[in-house]
From Swiss-Prot:
UniProt crosslink position (Glycyl lysine isopeptide (Lys-Gly) (interchain with G-Cter in ubiquitin)): 115, 208
Organism, scientific name: Mus musculus
Protein name: Proteasome subunit alpha type-1
Region (Disordered) location: 232-263
PTM per Swiss-Prot/TrEMBL: C-terminal extension is partially cleaved off by limited proteolysis leading to a conversion of the proteasome from its latent into its active form.
Family: Belongs to the peptidase T1A family.
Induction remarks: Up-regulated in liver tumor tissues. Up-regulated by the antioxidant dithiolethione (D3T) in liver, lung and colon (at the protein level).
Amino acid sequence: MFRNQYDNDVTVWSPQGRIHQIEYAMEAVKQGSATVGLKSKTHAVLVALKRAQSELAAHQKKILHVDNHIGISIAGLTADARLLCNFMRQECLDSRFVFDRPLPVSRLVSLIGSKTQIPTQRYGRRPYGVGLLIAGYDDMGPHIFQTCPSANYFDCRAMSIGARSQSARTYLERHMSEFMECNLDELVKHGLRALRETLPAEQDLTTKNVSIGIVGKDLEFTIYDDDDVSPFLDGLEERPQRKAQPSQAAEEPAEKADEPMEH
């Protein structure tokens, strides 16, 4: 990770045409707990894995309410996410006050992109170390957007960010053709299955470590936590076990139990 003089500030380019401070901020997103977003023709769903700093601490909130038609899930620095969430709430309030209408989701994402681009260009600033999945519903239908510390943003049919998110993205790519025709219950189950792929073999989803956000046609953005998640988890089949060779069947569980969870 030694970059010599090329990672001292966000305004310094390396000879390879890279800005290392932005790449470091992208790594912060990969250290956050995983979150998944996906949509059908009528709904957009966010599913996030909550993490507790210690056994004495409560689980951190991973899904935040922005407006009646928009919510976000986060991966990365929570403090940066809180600041961006407050900015988004203010923009939504301004739209309702000035224009008497909800702010279109794509317009809000564009404003976030403009705000997060500023610290990637100015001396003495650092990029926001958080990635967002934005779920919303407007006149154009349901939306899932991804934003990055580099100020890029993408309109997605499904996406996952955070630690071990590649496993979730593999699941989403494999089942992406099914999402558009799913009803709400099936869509949430797909999100939970994708999120479960990010966990080690010895762990599973529970009401304590999962949060769900749903928005759709005639449905305001709603967050489900703790016991409210139970109906969705109850309908989820058990996690399939990895196949092992007969001679190693007794040894492998002990070996896998020692594998640390990626942070």
